[in-house]
């Protein structure tokens, strides 16, 4: 059985940056956000169901899902969020578990923003949390996604608080510093964790 390291953190914490550093070391990465995008690509059955429910205006001109519009819609209408989650979550979980089962590397990095909220930590042998100050989260998310502070604060409120997240952590990467100046530090931390996870995985599979 592949050793599973669950990677999580709040919005704007830098999960993708950390995941890419592990990926550069040859570690297979399964990202819930990537899976969520892949299962609703143009022409997919799930996208058709989303269009039937929300209408054609939820699409971009090229026929792809307009994620910004969808995000704003479910922010304004909680009942739509419930419907969407009921549609997508089983499909996302099924695809992630399929990908986990076919891995042959000693361990896999499983990137799930709502790892704790969706009670998925039980699937992990180790939990790695990317931790930042709430102010950093807001600043980064606003710059990255061009979202309103209202929407970002709403997303943060829907996630577990920082203290709760840290209680689930076996390992923590502090990521408040500016990325450009802090990248060597992050690379070194990821390399240290990589060696640690290889040892743990090899011990489990011995």
Curated annotation (Swiss-Prot):
GO terms for biological process: coenzyme A biosynthetic process. It catalyses: 3'-dephospho-CoA + ATP = ADP + CoA + H(+). One of its GO terms (molecular function) is ATP binding. ATP binds at residues 12-17. Its main location: cytoplasm. The keyword Transferase applies. Coiled coil: none annotated. It is found in: Cytoplasm. It is an enzyme of class 2 (transferase). Signal peptide: none annotated. Keywords: ATP-binding, Coenzyme A biosynthesis, Cytoplasm, Kinase, Nucleotide-binding, Transferase. Belongs to the CoaE family. Its EC number is 2.7.1.24. PANTHER family: BIFUNCTIONAL COENZYME A SYNTHASE-RELATED, DEPHOSPHO-COA KINASE-RELATED. Pathway: Cofactor biosynthesis; coenzyme A biosynthesis; CoA from (R)-pantothenate: step 5/5. GO terms for cellular component: cytoplasm. This is Dephospho-CoA kinase. The keyword Chloroplast does not apply.
